[in-house]
Amino acid sequence: MKEIPITSFDNLQIGQAENAAAGTGCTVVLLGKDGAPAGLDVRGGGPASRESELLKPLAAAQVIHAIVLAGGSAFGLDAAGGVMRYLEERGIGFDVGVTKVPLVCQSDLFDLTVADAHTRPDAAMAYHACVNAESGNYRDGSYGAGTGATVGKLLGMDHCMKSGIGSYAVQVGPLQVGAVVAVNALGDIYDYETGRKAAGLLADDGRTFLDSELLALQSIEVKENKFVGNTTIGVVFTNARFDKSRLCKIAGMAQDGYARAIRPVHTTADGDSIYAVSLGDVAADQDVVGALGARVMAKAILRAVQAAEPAYGFPAVSSL
């Protein structure tokens, strides 16, 4: 098994755009002119999403044409309109005779409390991200959907750290599996291979880690003021051939990567979601791909916080 660039996959382009001053942005995943089968698994209690019904096994559509990861919470769902315009202009979408309708799914994270709550990803920003995908401008760190991402918010924004978007991909023989994830978790972030905490809840000194899980366990009383501005959203890619029902299972297995790297995870204050996409025709075991999906997702989460830069008054791993 060897690490490969996330750009190694055929039929995949990733572009990003952001408004750094406003603390928000979007990441667009384009899935080729013919689209690709995709599945979705949602574990968080507060998702903001678009066209997720398309990915259910009983839905008629067998492929989608793009996935958008964005900030802006539900306001940011406007961004998909820009992706649809970009794809329609290029004749990409589901043929309905008079035009082609691009099938674009989207999940958003909450970054409204970071800088400017009234500036969010919109159609223009997402269209720009599509144009950027042509030149492959994807970068890990505080870009795209990760622009306003933060982690460790059990005690609110005053004790959190800056996060971002991260990627990781591997190849085993002809099989490729990779992940891109925007990490905006309530919980803390860990290197699952060493058990070391990498980022998360900070004490009043702004440098010492506190343990979010231990703090949460100090009282079983219902917390009415739990900070709700969270959500980790990601995509697993593989060049193996699967239909969307199997991809839903692979996405579910990839959620184990969230559980390895984020503690606590899948809370009612998160909207944790993972897409899984098939980009090729390699014959591979579904469970092997799912297990690799969990591995690359956990590694991508770690990379998201390691690549982030301090911003908006929030420290990052690089500044501790």
Residue ranges: model-predicted function:
Residues M84:
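Acidic/His-rich segments in extracytoplasmic proteins that coordinate ligands and/or metal ions
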